[in-house]
Amino acid sequence: MIGRLRGSLAEKQPPHLVLDVNGVGYEVEVPMTTLYRLPHVGETVTLHTHLVVREDAHLLYGFYEKRERELFRELIRLNGVGPKLALALMSGLEVDELVRCVQAQDTSALTRIPGVGKKTAERLLVELKDRFKAWEALPGTFTLVSNGPNQAEPVASAESDAVSALISLGYKPQEASKAVSAIKEKDLSSADLIRRALKGMG
């Protein structure tokens, strides 16, 4: 099991990144909440990781904080929740926000996530109710080496990356494109575009 990786951020293509660890490039899929906090390409970063072994692939998932990884592991234990849906949930809601949803049994927040209908949201909240106290108590012990602003990206490239990331989360291409195009602010990074688009679609 690969539990943690520390290396140079070689590539950042939402929702994937490549981490160069002593000359070996590890492709890692991350939730948007982790993507927002990544340093510049070329800088050092540490990620808490979870490895999923399948017959046809070994898949690595990375997280900014250790408690995010623990939440991911709990989510994929739930009936009908695989890594894709777990990442979508964690991309739409911060850990503390998800805990509050469970406390309040708030289905509306979950149904805004692609692939989560009302019945699924109700079931997830019931199953999560007994676990949120443990998550709430998990310490946030992980800190990135650098948390500076994102590097400037070409506008067309940033918008394209943002649309691709939203599609990977389950949004329809037309929805993703419309949400990104609706953002009036200029010269935003792909991470900022994704964040604003998700809020707009919420």
From Swiss-Prot:
Residues 1-64 are annotated as: Domain I. Keywords: Cytoplasm, DNA damage, DNA recombination, DNA repair, DNA-binding. Residues 154-202 are annotated as: Domain III. GO terms for biological process: DNA recombination; DNA repair. SUPFAM superfamilies: DNA helicase RuvA subunit, C-terminal domain (SSF46929), Nucleic acid-binding proteins (SSF50249), RuvA domain 2-like (SSF47781). Residues 144-153 are annotated as: Flexible linker. Disulfide bonds: none annotated. The keyword Magnesium does not apply. GO terms for cellular component: cytoplasm; Holliday junction helicase complex; Holliday junction resolvase complex. It is found in: Cytoplasm. Residues 65-143 are annotated as: Domain II. One of its GO terms (molecular function) is four-way junction DNA binding. CDD domains: UBA_RuvA_C (cd14332). Homotetramer. Forms an RuvA(8)-RuvB(12)-Holliday junction (HJ) complex. HJ DNA is sandwiched between 2 RuvA tetramers; dsDNA enters through RuvA and exits via RuvB. An RuvB hexamer assembles on each DNA strand where it exits the tetramer. Each RuvB hexamer is contacted by two RuvA subunits (via domain III) on 2 adjacent RuvB subunits; this complex drives branch migration. In the full resolvosome a probable DNA-RuvA(4)-RuvB(12)-RuvC(2) complex forms which resolves the HJ. Has three domains with a flexible linker between the domains II and III and assumes an 'L' shape. Domain III is highly mobile and contacts RuvB. NCBIfam families: ruvA. Belongs to the RuvA family. The RuvA-RuvB-RuvC complex processes Holliday junction (HJ) DNA during genetic recombination and DNA repair, while the RuvA-RuvB complex plays an important role in the rescue of blocked DNA replication forks via replication fork reversal (RFR). RuvA specifically binds to HJ cruciform DNA, conferring on it an open structure. The RuvB hexamer acts as an ATP-dependent pump, pulling dsDNA into and through the RuvAB complex. HJ branch migration allows RuvC to scan DNA until it finds its consensus sequence, where it cleaves and resolves the cruciform DNA. This is Holliday junction branch migration complex subunit RuvA. It comes from Pseudomonas syringae pv. syringae (strain B728a). The gene is ruvA.
